[in-house]
Amino acid sequence: MGGSLLSACGGGNLSDDSPATPRLASVDNFRDVAGAAPYPTVDGRQMRRGVFYRANALTLDTADHAAIDRLGIASVYDLRTPEESARTADSLPGGATTRTLNVLGTADFVVPAVDTAAAAVAFMETQARGYVTGAAQRAAYGALLTSLADGPGAQLFHSSAGKDRAGWIAALLLSIANVPLDVIMQDYLLSNVYLALWIKAQTDTLRQQGGDAAASVHAPLLSVQENYLQAGFDQVKASYGTMASYLTQGLGISQATINTLHSRLVV
């Protein structure tokens, strides 16, 4: 792939002197949206690190709390349902404000009852398409992008595992930054690397409870696959024609907001 989902919208030319993003043992899918390198754009520029971070639930231990505090995160956006947030409360970075944006619009996220791996894959693809078509999803993502554009300082958004709800908004930000499509997909799939120990632990538990069959059936729910993100992109094309139309018409954000995000995202 080599194209981008959204044409460039302008931006600054500041140098990237941000510190390396720490690996957090207690929040294993924590990372900089801009990547470790950082990511290149299709027009020869690169993303700016230290602006937006993504994560799974913020179950910070003492050492990781100290590490994340050094990043100066001013705002945290929790994309989970109320019941998810109640079960696993966030440990916020020092001085950060928090806002809940319930992407699913339901009281809780209920793991579906599936009896085949194919059914699990179908559920994940349907969920990805719902990020594009669902009213609650569009409202939450539109509000999040607006807040990310307007908010001062570094900002963090997270879901439970940090791979699906958070993975979609990260893909949107990379699209706004004009990152190549293959890089966007590679970034999406990195959740499988960052969450490897968690995936193994969940798989081992499923195997102990229901044998190899149960572990195999539920495996697609624990990880990300290229076809999940592609299902979302395909739905954008089917429903709105272009990513730009999805952002402005579907999510209700202005071109000025897109321009501001691009300026913040790209060096």
Where are these regions (language model features)?
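Cys-dependent protein tyrosine phosphatase-like superfamily
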Residues: 1-155, 169-267
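Ser/Thr-glycine-rich phosphate-binding loops at phosphate-binding pockets of nucleotides
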Residues: 161, 165-166
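Histidine-centered active-site/metal-ligand motif
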Residues: 158
